[in-house]
Amino acid sequence: MYRALTKDIEVVVEPFYLEEQSDPEDDRYVWGYRIVISNNSAIAVRLVNRYWNITDQNGQVDEVTGPGVVGEQPRLSPGDTYEYSSGCPLDTPSGLMFGHYQMETDEGEMFDVDIPAFSLDSPGLLRVLN
């Protein structure tokens, strides 16, 4: 698992290889990842936007931005957690992802919460990027 803490908001990521959706002979490698966001702060926040930097084994970078996560913009009161799962396909057997969430307080203050860098490694492959 990979962890990051920003302003008492913790992001934990657990990536996993999706062998049944991958086809190495066709250069298709797919990972899922489970993310748990815990609001350990004293204020409520809403996850407004996301930013991902996805880098494959060859250094090809794909930047992804958009509103919320998996179609939601969850509000986390102090002590709340929010969990979701998503996925990422690559053309190479290894990669790296990191990013941030843009959060907004009830007072309208915006700030970024780090998503830790995490490896996407095919089973049996030595770690290349992390």
UniProtKB/Swiss-Prot annotation:
The cross-references to Gene3D superfamilies, in alphabetical order and at most eight, read: ApaG domain
| SUPFAM superfamilies, per database record | ApaG-like
Disulfide pattern: none
GO BP, sorted A to Z: error-free translesion synthesis
- In this protein, which residues make up the domain named ApaG? 3-127
> Can you say what this protein is called?
Protein ApaG
Q: Which Pfam families match?
A: DUF525 (PF04379)
Q: Which NCBIfam families match?
A: PRK05461.1 (NF003967)
Q: Which species is listed as the source? A: Rhizobium leguminosarum bv. trifolii (strain WSM2304)
